[in-house]
Amino acid sequence: MNLPNIDQIKTYLLDLQDKICAALAQADGSAKFTEENWVREEGGGGRSRVMVKGAVFEQAGVNFSHVSGAALPASATAHRPELAGRSFQALGVSLVIHPNSPYLPTSHANVRFFIAEKPDEDPVWWFGGGFDLTPFYGFEEDAIHWHQTAYNLCQPFGEQLYSRYKKWCDDYFYIKHRNEARGIGGLFFDDLNSPDFDTCFNFTQAVGDGFLDAYMPIVARRKALCWGEREREFQLYRRGRYVEFNLVWDRGTLFGLQTGGRTESILMSMPPLVRWEYNYQPAADSAEVALYRDFLPVKDWLAAGEHH
């Protein structure tokens, strides 16, 4: 078994952050990312980058963090007693993009690595990550492209991976109190540590690198569409679902806040503007109702693509 190489992972993640920020800034054309390097008292730190009030992106946050500690918090060892008494390191890149246009979907991606070590014992380690898409006004062509990209990057690693990680994503990004999916899903994986380090790292890199391939063509296709107040109002209302999921159900957000993580970085995923409306119902046969009818129910998007 080849042992994890933390320097190798860190180099990849910093490079991924650079690459994604460069692509987003280029697509925006007017705004730039501001960078903040921060240090965590208990160990480690990170590099947070945020772009606000752009021509295309209202807010885009791309975070790198590498935190470490002498012992894991209770919230982390409750489910995994074998981790108690081990020192740990957690590295990752996570991003959330909130475009201006209601015709551009919100997008989220994350790749991460975790290792817990103890002298004279094998380290416990795993990778996790994925990406998911949250449209307001859906386009079938975009949904098919998003899932086809996810399928293609999974294929070299196993025939069943796409369907397994797609289902995991559908199950994870589900807003239970609304009985509704957060978006159209994508990929989600966690606890990945077999068959060996190199294979797991290669797959995680494929997911990280695949994000731009999945998202940027959608941005290029839709960013020039005209929209008005009605579309904006619906976008802001649907962003409320994003906030509800992140603050009530998301494990990463809760873990970060409970373990004294950097609050500004954790809450960078929040949309800058959002609205709630009591008992909102979209009009029958409207463009808004199409989201609920055609996009949020779990769907085999690859099969949808074959019908064209």
Curated annotation (Swiss-Prot):
<comment type="subunit">
    <text>Homodimer.</text>
</comment>
<comment type="pathway">
    <text>Porphyrin-containing compound metabolism; protoporphyrin-IX biosynthesis; protoporphyrinogen-IX from coproporphyrinogen-III (O2 route): step 1/1.</text>
</comment>
<dbReference type="GO" id="GO:0046872">
    <property type="term" value="F:metal ion binding"/>
</dbReference>
<keyword id="KW-0627">Porphyrin biosynthesis</keyword>
<feature type="binding site">
    <location>
        <position position="147"/>
    </location>
    <ligand>
        <name>a divalent metal cation</name>
    </ligand>
</feature>
<keyword id="KW-0350">Heme biosynthesis</keyword>
<feature type="binding site">
    <location>
        <begin position="110"/>
        <end position="112"/>
    </location>
    <ligand>
        <name>substrate</name>
    </ligand>
</feature>
<dbReference type="GO" id="GO:0042803">
    <property type="term" value="F:protein homodimerization activity"/>
</dbReference>
<dbReference type="Pfam" id="PF01218">
    <property type="entry name" value="Coprogen_oxidas"/>
</dbReference>
<feature type="binding site">
    <location>
        <position position="177"/>
    </location>
    <ligand>
        <name>a divalent metal cation</name>
    </ligand>
</feature>
<dbReference type="InterPro" id="IPR018375">
    <property type="entry name" value="Coprogen_oxidase_CS"/>
</dbReference>
<feature type="binding site">
    <location>
        <begin position="260"/>
        <end position="262"/>
    </location>
    <ligand>
        <name>substrate</name>
    </ligand>
</feature>
<comment type="similarity">
    <text>Belongs to the aerobic coproporphyrinogen-III oxidase family.</text>
</comment>
<dbReference type="GO" id="GO:0005737">
    <property type="term" value="C:cytoplasm"/>
</dbReference>
<dbReference type="InterPro" id="IPR036406">
    <property type="entry name" value="Coprogen_oxidase_aer_sf"/>
</dbReference>
<keyword id="KW-0560">Oxidoreductase</keyword>
<feature type="binding site">
    <location>
        <position position="108"/>
    </location>
    <ligand>
        <name>a divalent metal cation</name>
    </ligand>
</feature>
<feature type="site" description="Important for dimerization">
    <location>
        <position position="177"/>
    </location>
</feature>
<feature type="active site" description="Proton donor">
    <location>
        <position position="108"/>
    </location>
</feature>
<protein>
    <recommendedName>
        <fullName>Oxygen-dependent coproporphyrinogen-III oxidase</fullName>
        <ecNumber>1.3.3.3</ecNumber>
    </recommendedName>
</protein>
<dbReference type="InterPro" id="IPR001260">
    <property type="entry name" value="Coprogen_oxidase_aer"/>
</dbReference>
<feature type="binding site">
    <location>
        <position position="98"/>
    </location>
    <ligand>
        <name>a divalent metal cation</name>
    </ligand>
</feature>
<keyword id="KW-0963">Cytoplasm</keyword>
<dbReference type="GO" id="GO:0006782">
    <property type="term" value="P:protoporphyrinogen IX biosynthetic process"/>
</dbReference>
<keyword id="KW-0479">Metal-binding</keyword>
<comment type="function">
    <text>Involved in the heme biosynthesis. Catalyzes the aerobic oxidative decarboxylation of propionate groups of rings A and B of coproporphyrinogen-III to yield the vinyl groups in protoporphyrinogen-IX.</text>
</comment>
<feature type="region of interest" description="Important for dimerization">
    <location>
        <begin position="242"/>
        <end position="277"/>
    </location>
</feature>
<dbReference type="GO" id="GO:0004109">
    <property type="term" value="F:coproporphyrinogen oxidase activity"/>
</dbReference>
<feature type="binding site">
    <location>
        <position position="94"/>
    </location>
    <ligand>
        <name>substrate</name>
    </ligand>
</feature>
